[in-house]
Amino acid sequence: MALPEFSMRQLLEAGAHFGHQTHRWNPKMDRYIFGSRSNIHIIDLSQSIPLLHQALVKVREVAAAGGRVLFVGTKRQASDPVATAAKRCAQYYVNHRWLGGTLTNWRTVSGSIARLRELEGVLAGEGQGRSKKELLQLTRERDKLELSLGGIKDMGGIPDIMFVIDTNKEAIAILEARKLNIPVVAILDTNCDPDGITYPIPGNDDAARALQLYCDLIADAVLDGLAAGQAAAGVDLGASVAPVEPALARELAPEAPAAEAAPESAEG
């Protein structure tokens, strides 16, 4: 595989260049705005393209090193693309509601994940010995935990990089990542604050096609990184083993005749 490719045409067709109404802008985004049309800000995609490429390179690098990538997008139109993309590349996601302390209080969150697994085990066994009322309560508790923690229950620790759609809605998640020095890749619409975003990507954060494109590209970068990491491990293994074989061959070669002769002398 190779780093996923994308074009200006793809971004335009997805509507990535359409910002918000001009009166809803964040002045800090001024440098990424090309102009306005019908009171709608137009994002300068000539800047978005190299920034998106830079972000994909970083995501690939993290995945190649075996790092965890967390997709975050809890608003309605981002929920499905985020979950689908994360699952496709065997990574993690939060797509319903960000629980405060998800990253900064991981120990407590781990306890909730343990409870979720316990409930899954009980309900998988059909809750033998429990009343219908108890089972209903347990099912509701499980479903509630699954919504918030289902996408991170296998993460095993804090992520190494986080991909975010809508920095305004996910402000708490971004603050937690910053406290822990976790790099943040984020889509920045014209009403967003770019401060504190490690890898900013100016683009529309509402259009369904745009969100799908971003998520697909990030997932493809992860998959490429995973493939590269496996290939590198194979090359390193071969490199460490190969030089030994000729040496062993040279050392063992003189011993072979003696070893073969031993049974003959014993028989004699």
From Swiss-Prot:
GO terms for cellular component: cytosolic small ribosomal subunit. Gene3D superfamilies: Glucose-6-phosphate isomerase like protein, domain 1, Helix hairpin bin. It holds the Pfam family Ribosomal_S2. The keyword Ribosomal protein applies. GO terms for biological process: translation. Keywords: Ribonucleoprotein, Ribosomal protein. GO terms for molecular function: structural constituent of ribosome. The keyword Ribonucleoprotein applies. Belongs to the universal ribosomal protein uS2 family. This is Small ribosomal subunit protein uS2.
